């Protein structure tokens, strides 16, 4: 989304703009400089980066608002524990090299997915076909390591693909050093009705990848053997 345009329109009517910047981290996008009033991050994800912390931060541009948020956080007990804070700060030290590895692997996987006959559509802002590509190029310094794609296969083929993966773990989280795959329709967005999922563009064949920092060749090989097994499952169904 165009943060600058949204912020300008919001400020005209006296509204404040809060941006969740979790998927990109402060290294790839700085919403406050684009006009946002508050930026939030799930520190559980890229900032910590090792999937061993649950936490979050809210950063306000206005010092008075920031002071008010601190006051309420203390009153309500919303502050992190000492050890969680230590782990988060320790992870933050390696954010830059981790993000480089995340993005390099993502680029490699995107190139691979575009050659796969079982892949019907790919969603990632680095692709010119993505509706937000130009906005992302303008306001980000990188495109991130979250991507999704739709398989052109049956439910049995999809299940076979997921079961065949060994490096990608089936899980809902994201932003850690390990690679994860999720099936939004039955996991993150399961509470939505089928009609609501369809309206949101969440098909039964949609998969989401959080690309980790393992060796890129190994990740591609893992996906390749998953597609191979899914193809065999498809062929077996056709024989029946």
Predicted regions and their residues:
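Conserved PLP-enzyme active-site core in the AAT-like
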Residues: 1-118, 123
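Short, flexible turn/loop "capping" segments at secondary-structure junctions
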Residues: 49-50, 80-82, 139-142, 199-204
């Amino acid at each position: 989304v165009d943060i600058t345009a949204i912020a300008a329109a919001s400020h005209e009517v006296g509204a404040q703009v809060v941006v969740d910047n979790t998927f990109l981290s402060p290294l790839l996008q700085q919403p406050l400089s684009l006009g946002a009033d508050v930026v939030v991050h799930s520190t559980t994800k890229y900032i910590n980066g090792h999937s061993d912390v649950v936490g979050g931060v809210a950063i306000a541009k206005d010092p008075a608002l920031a002071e008010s948020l601190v006051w309420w956080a203390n009153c309500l007990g919303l502050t992190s524990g000492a050890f969680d804070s230590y782990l988060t700060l320790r992870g933050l030290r390696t954010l830059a090299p981790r993000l480089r590895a995340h993005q390099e692997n993502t680029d490699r996987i995107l190139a691979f997915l575009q050659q796969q006959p079982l892949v019907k559509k790919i969603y990632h802002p680095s692709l010119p076909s993505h509706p937000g590509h130009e906005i992302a190029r303008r306001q980000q310094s990188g495109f991130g390591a979250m991507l999704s794609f739709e398989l052109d296969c049956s439910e049995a083929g999809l299940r076979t693909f997921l079961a065949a993966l060994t490096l990608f773990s089936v899980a809902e989280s994201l932003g850690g050093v390990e690679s994860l795959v999720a099936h939004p329709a039955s996991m993150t967005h399961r509470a939505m009705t089928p009609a609501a999922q369809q309206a949101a563009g969440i098909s039964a064949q949609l998969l989401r990848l959080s690309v980790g920092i393992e060796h890129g060749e190994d990740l591609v090989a893992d996906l390749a053997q998953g597609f191979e097994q899914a193809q065999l499952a498809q062929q077996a169904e056709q024989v029946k």
